[in-house]
């Protein structure tokens, strides 16, 4: 109670001393009085700062603290400032740092209270020193609070000292804005008591330290002003410093972000030149498109520079066209083979090499083990590089050859031949061969010069192939043929007889064919072709009814067509016989280049193939070219026979539209239909017509195609 009274008295005197001017130093007596006042009120000196940190001190304490601190309690550890203003500002800041943390441990109260420097006055309803609180009023408020604090001071002093020592090393946590918020929150009386006791003990320690140093002499007015302006300002400065630090950090972060953004923009700007402008890009894209197209045209659309072409496979597609051309030419150049041009496919996996001569081409084909960029290349003659029409125009058909003839022997006769292909069956030569030349002119020249030449004891017969040969057949003219038939049809032939057997009998025959069934057995008849009508007529007269292998044969002239298979006028449809039972319509169609569809005649009851069918083309020219190419060819291992299909209306058995029982020509169905016997068609029971009805259905009359006629043998 005595201390509180003294404190109140001191504050009253402080009020009276406010008017005098600022004084830096006073008499020694005044210093002693100030020290005595510090003794009486020293306990409250640190209270406001403790309160500021704890937000639990009363306003009176806070006012006294700031005054006493400013007047007589300079910070012992810190340097005393010369000017009172600086001292006042410095002292509370330093004091605020240490006690603020000291209270945090024992009290363990809310963080908001500990952080607020100006929070205390709000609790008691008193105005804070920053707002110009009067010392007299604060002293009165202090009396009511101090009564409860005196009893507990001594008991808690030891604990508080330990707490203070521990807490002095902890950094202060000061937030100006948080202090304002904490000022609004009320604190309990128990908290005030504990904190007051701690502050009193701290004040005593500060008094001892202040005696050793020189006391600052400040007038009461100065002391009064100090709490109002200095303490909150200092608190504000600390908070502002923290805010400034935060703002600086934020500014630094923003600066870093801006720098990153600038770097990204710079990178984008650097990348932008790489991306072409829309117009430029469009041009480049056009160029990119044009290059492959030009390359493609060069490879696929270009004609070979020479007729001596070589196919090369298994190239390295990872290399460029230029690299491949150089690498492909090198191995041939090392072998003294002149390469005219090298063409590669668009995928660069294959290519073609054009040579100057057929000799170079043949030598190139003999080379083995050639490697290009590590890949062993495949060498062979190109397949289908030239159209069959072009190849047929420069190809001759050689007949009446010895069955023992070889390609080398023919090569000696036809020296300028580009390719020679012997026709064989079951590994045995059939006595015919196809001889291809460089050009159509060379083929014509050889036909004139080598016609009838003797090869291995036999006179060879040469014929044109392709369209030129078809025209000659229609006109009945060929190099050695007359308008008369040069083919004999031989019937009642022994099933064991072979073409070799017949060749021994008919020595002048240029072509002999013995048709076989699906099992490879003879059908009992044959076609024998001669070089001239006179030879055919002579054979007919001398060999008719001759016995061959136990059977008497019958001979007759086939007709003026000059070919065993040319028994009717050309059309858009080919008749194919001798098919295997396993042959499908798809296989049949694929066997004839240029065909549009194919159909195989099957048995109505069993559904099995009858061994023949029809192949349609878009034009007669396509049909002729296909017929010539497949002459004496094989399908699924069976040798097939080709003929022109009969035009509509000429066949019996209802043509394609009628069923087998109709006999009604074109329109008859199975029930007889319109025609009766013969109907509208020319033939009666003859003709090869469609036995099954075909596309026209059972009712007949559909969009049927013409068929060939049936050859009848006695």
UniProtKB/Swiss-Prot annotation:
Sequence repeats: 57-64, 74-81, 82-89, 90-97, 98-103, 104-111, 119-126, 127-134
Modified residues (N6-acetyllysine): 9, 15-16, 95, 101, 108, 115, 123, 319, 349, 378, 399, 428, 445, 468, 477, 513, 521, 572, 577, 646
Task of the protein: Nucleolin is the major nucleolar protein of growing eukaryotic cells. It is found associated with intranucleolar chromatin and pre-ribosomal particles. It induces chromatin decondensation by binding to histone H1. It is thought to play a role in pre-rRNA transcription and ribosome assembly. May play a role in the process of transcriptional elongation. Binds RNA oligonucleotides with 5'-UUAGGG-3' repeats more tightly than the telomeric single-stranded DNA 5'-TTAGGG-3' repeats.
Keyword presence, RNA-binding: yes
Crosslink position(s): Glycyl lysine isopeptide (Lys-Gly) (interchain with G-Cter in SUMO2): 298, 325, 371, 378, 513, 577, 589, 624
Modification after translation: Some glutamate residues are glycylated by TTLL8. This modification occurs exclusively on glutamate residues and results in a glycine chain on the gamma-carboxyl group.
Quaternary structure and interacting proteins, as annotated: Identified in a IGF2BP1-dependent mRNP granule complex containing untranslated mRNAs. Component of the SWAP complex that consists of NPM1, NCL/nucleolin, PARP1 and SWAP70. Component of a complex which is at least composed of HTATSF1/Tat-SF1, the P-TEFb complex components CDK9 and CCNT1, RNA polymerase II, SUPT5H, and NCL/nucleolin. Interacts with AICDA. Interacts with APTX. Interacts with C1QBP. Interacts with ERBB4. Interacts (via C-terminus) with FMR1 isoform 6 (via N-terminus). Interacts with GZF1; this interaction is important for nucleolar localization of GZF1. Interacts with NSUN2.
Location(s), subcellular: Nucleus, Nucleolus; Cytoplasm
In-chain residues carrying the UniProt-annotated modification Phosphothreonine: 68, 75, 83, 91, 98, 105, 112, 120, 219, 368, 406
Region (Disordered) residue spans: 1-303, 642-714
Descriptive protein name: Nucleolin
Residue stretches of biased makeup (Basic and acidic residues): 285-301
Region listing for 8 X 8 AA tandem repeats of X-T-P-X-K-K-X-X, in residue ranges: 57-134
Omega-N-methylarginine PTM sites in chain numbering: 695
Asymmetric dimethylarginine modified-residue sites: 656, 660, 666, 670, 674, 680, 682, 688, 692, 695
Compositional bias per record (Gly residues), positions renumbered to this chain: 650-703
């Amino acid at each position: 109670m005595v201390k509180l009274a003294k404190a109140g008295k001191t504050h009253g005197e402080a009020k009276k001393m406010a008017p005098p001017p600022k004084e830096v130093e006073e008499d020694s007596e005044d210093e002693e009085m100030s020290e005595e006042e510090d003794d009486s009120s020293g306990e409250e000196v640190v209270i406001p700062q403790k309160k500021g940190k704890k937000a639990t001190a009363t306003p009176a304490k806070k006012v006294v603290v700031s005054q006493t601190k400013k007047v007589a309690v300079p910070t012992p550890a810190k340097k005393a400032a010369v000017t009172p203003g600086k001292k006042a500002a410095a002292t509370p800041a330093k004091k605020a740092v240490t006690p603020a943390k000291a209270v945090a441990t024992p009290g363990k109260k809310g963080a908001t209270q500990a952080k607020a420097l100006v929070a205390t006055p709000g609790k008691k309803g008193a105005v804070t020193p920053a707002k110009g609180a009067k010392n007299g009023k604060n002293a009165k408020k202090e009396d009511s609070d101090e009564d409860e604090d005196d009893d507990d001071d001594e008991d808690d002093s030891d604990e508080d000292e330990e707490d203070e020592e521990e807490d002095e090393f902890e950094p202060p946590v000061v937030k100006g804005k948080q202090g304002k918020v904490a000022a609004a929150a009320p604190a309990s009386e128990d908290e005030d008591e504990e904190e007051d006791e701690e502050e009193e003990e701290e004040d005593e320690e500060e008094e001892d330290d202040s005696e050793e140093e020189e006391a600052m002499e400040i007038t009461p007015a100065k002391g009064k002003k100090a709490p109002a302006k200095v303490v909150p300002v200092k608190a504000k400065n600390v908070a502002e410093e923290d805010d400034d630090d935060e703002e600086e950090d934020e500014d630094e972060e923003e600066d870093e972000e801006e720098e990153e953004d600038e770097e990204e923009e710079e990178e984008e700007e650097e990348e932008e030149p790489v991306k072409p402008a829309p117009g430029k890009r469009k041009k480049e894209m056009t160029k990119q498109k044009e290059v492959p197209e030009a390359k493609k045209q060069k490879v696929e659309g270009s004609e070979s520079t020479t007729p001596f072409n070589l196919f090369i496979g298994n190239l390295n597609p990872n290399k460029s066209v230029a690299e491949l051309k150089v690498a492909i030419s090198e191995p041939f150049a090392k072998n003294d083979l002149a390469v005219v041009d090298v063409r590669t496919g668009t995928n660069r996996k294959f290519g073609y090499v054009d040579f100057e001569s057929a000799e170079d081409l043949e030598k190139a084909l003999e080379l083995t083990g050639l490697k290009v960029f590590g890949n062993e290349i495949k060498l062979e003659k190109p397949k289908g590089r030239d159209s069959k029409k072009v190849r047929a125009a420069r190809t001759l058909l050689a007949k009446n050859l010895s069955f023992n003839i070889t390609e080398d022997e023919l090569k000696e006769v036809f020296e300028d031949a580009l390719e020679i292909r012997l026709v064989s069956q079951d590994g045995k030569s059939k006595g015919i061969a196809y001889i291809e030349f460089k050009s159509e002119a060379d083929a014509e020249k050889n036909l004139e010069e080598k016609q009838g030449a003797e090869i291995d004891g036999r006179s060879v017969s040469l014929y044109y192939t392709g369209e030129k040969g078809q025209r000659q057949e229609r006109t009945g003219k060929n190099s050695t043929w007359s308008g008369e038939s040069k083919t004999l049809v031989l019937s009642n032939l022994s099933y064991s007889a072979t073409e070799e057997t017949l060749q021994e009998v008919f020595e002048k025959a240029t072509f002999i064919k013995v048709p076989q069934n699906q099992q490879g057995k003879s059908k009992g008849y044959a076609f024998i072709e001669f070089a001239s009508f006179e030879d055919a007529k002579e054979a007919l007269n001398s060999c008719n009814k001759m016995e061959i292998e136990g059977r008497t044969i019958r001979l007759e002239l086939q007709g003026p067509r000059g070919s065993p298979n040319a028994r009717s006028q050309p059309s858009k449809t080919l008749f194919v016989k001798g098919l295997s039972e396993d042959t499908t319509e798809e296989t049949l169609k694929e066997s004839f280049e240029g065909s549009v569809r194919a159909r195989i005649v099957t048995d109505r009851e069993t559904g099995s193939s009858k061994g023949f069918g029809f192949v349609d083309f878009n034009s007669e020219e396509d049909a002729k070219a296909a017929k010539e190419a497949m002459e004496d060819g094989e399908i699924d291992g069976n040798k097939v026979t080709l003929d022109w299909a009969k035009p509509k209306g000429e066949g019996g058995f209802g043509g394609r539209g009628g069923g087998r029982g109709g006999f009604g020509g074109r329109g008859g169905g199975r029930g007889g239909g319109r025609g009766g016997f013969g109907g509208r068609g020319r033939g009666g029971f003859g003709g090869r017509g469609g036995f099954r009805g075909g596309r026209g259905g059972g009712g007949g009359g559909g969009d049927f195609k013409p068929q060939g006629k049936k050859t009848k043998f006695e």
